[in-house]
Amino acid sequence: MDLEYGPEYERFRHEIEQFLAETPRDIDRRSFLLAATELGYVYRHIPKRFGGSEQPFDPIRETIVAECFDASPFPWRLGPQSTGMIVPTLLEAGADWQRERFIPPTLLGDAVWCQGYSEPGAGSDLASLRSHARLEGDEW
């Protein structure tokens, strides 16, 4: 198994590192994300009409971006809860009005999402939920 990225991906890594090195340290989050999106470094698989850069999904590039951003001096991370769970769900199953209303502010960090559920015996693993019904008189 070859775990090396290869020249194409190393060039991509170098581009991102150069972008991060040249970005002013006092840049605000919104401007930073807009610039990174315009260059195709973040939100690659999200359509342009929602604020993405509309490129094919590439898990290796996604990994390189995450590694470079995590190693950067910038305090922002690409909120996996918001952009990794909510946005793909909206793209796949959301109504048009939901996509238009929620995706753009989520990508810019203006909307932050979280999960708020926990069930006895399952925690946050909703796939392991169990239920049962019991007939009591005429009602279940």
Predicted feature descriptions by range:
Residues 77-97, 123:
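N-terminal glycine-rich flavin-associated loop
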